Amino acid sequence: MMPRNWKSVLSIAITSLLTSAGMPRLAVAQTRVSIGVTETMETYNPYGDSVALLYDLYSEVTGPFCSYNFATGEYEGRLAQRWEIKDPNTWVFYLDKRYTFNDGSPVTSADVVHSMSRVLAPDSKHTTLASPMLKAEAVDKYTVKLITKNPTAPLLDFICDRFIITSKAAYEKYGAADADRYHMLGGGPYARKEMVPGQRIVLVKRPDHHEAKKNPQAPDEIVFRPMREPEQRVTALLNNEIQIAQFIPPHLRKRVEASPHHKVVAADSLELMFLAMQPKPPFDKKEVRQAVCYAIDRDKIIATLLEGFATRLDGPIGPGQYGYDPNLQPRYGYNPQKAKQLLSQAGYPNGVDVELQTPVGRYTLDKQITEAMVPMLNAVGIRTRLATPEWPTLWANVQAGKVPFYYMGRGQVLDPSPPLHQYFRTGVTPRIGYSNPKVDEILFKEQEEFDPAKRKKYLAQAMSLITEEAPACFMWRHKLLWGISDKVDYQPPPDAGIFGLHIKVRR
């Protein structure tokens, strides 16, 4: 168990470890916060994965291009101080000259152009950001144009908290692999000190950074520790091995609440949980996909397993998200008889065998939830075998379009346009592989429409058609529970992001 004087015990010298990466000499770290997280990154390449933790981490290390402020409900400048729309396909961004890489060199438009080229590269996993983009062009040292293939009204939702800016000079000097692994230069308030894929990621604060000065109580060092099992995260929290535990399942919250030195903090989530179905037999039949949606008793799962800590979804998005329509049709109430009829209409009167793949420990009670779904599906004739591959394997196969039926979430959904294009527009990603020319047409129209009222109408049309076609069954948004030590103050945002500058270490 960690001693109570944990801050002094955890004081560490970091100077020598950073110098090899071309970083400035920093002071001895006085405070460290360890965080138990549910996922990790399997590559040093910041453009080589697209998990939520990657965007959180590199927002700290490279500084986000721009960011969404949940308190004001507006996008605000960061690396890009301000912007303007020159024409429907051209956005001009003016960089904040205060930002420098951790070797002291300025962050310039050349770095933005370089970074966009990496986003658009064939090996990039940032396909959602890449989908509307044509190119970036430098206007002058601190001014850059982002040019889209077509008018893209929600462009800020594609790039803010998503567009990672890395050093062109480091890339050219060391090459991509060594620059990413050994010379990760960023303009953010933290520097990447250590990364062991699958084990830990360590960030250290840049105390002279103008953003770091806004929160003097932000931890000097942050350690992200992947812990798949919720019991592991809770135990580590109560043993003071970590100070923040991500995603405590409802049935374990009382263990945390019973501790005089810990608490549970709830945060509404913007993550959409769904069952995805590739259009391959038997899911090439719309009736089979709809049968799956009717077979799942979402209200029962929310009331029992989730103990009410979730909001049911009757379409791709829910209350509070841009373009939400409470009257969206159709709706899939629990109706096993209807599911059986649809299965028979699809040509499977005697049922059909399928495999459902789920992560374990990535989302709240993911394995237990899918275990509860299996008998519901079996009851209507969809004979289901549950598979639980390791997360790196499952995630790689989902991104490659190799998983016909799976349970997963899509996080950080403020505006539904990016995820709708990502999962349901032809050719953007193979994660579901769904293709419908009518859906494509509507999605292009909504993306090109700068009038908010008209755009919301297009979004409603697209979401209604997608719900009817059912390439995915939309389940719920979790109300996420976090375990917090009394050594820190932290209120997780609705996008479940983990940002060091939002954490205050109690002195």
Annotated model-derived regions:
Residues 25, 84, 128-172, 194:
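Surface-exposed binding/hinge segments that line
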Residues 69-74, 161-217, 221-223, 229-231, ...:
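Gly/Pro-rich hinge or "lid" segments in bacterial periplasmic/extracellular proteins
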Residues 36-87, 94, 117, 185:
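N-terminal lobe/hinge region of extracytoplasmic solute-binding protein
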Residues 312-345, 363-367:
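Structural transition elements
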Residues 197, 344-412, 452, 480:
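Ligand/substrate-recognition segments at binding pockets and active sites
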Residues 208-255, 375, 383:
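Ligand-site clamp/hinge motif
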Residues 482-507:
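Long beta-strand-rich cores associated with HINT superfamily self-processing modules
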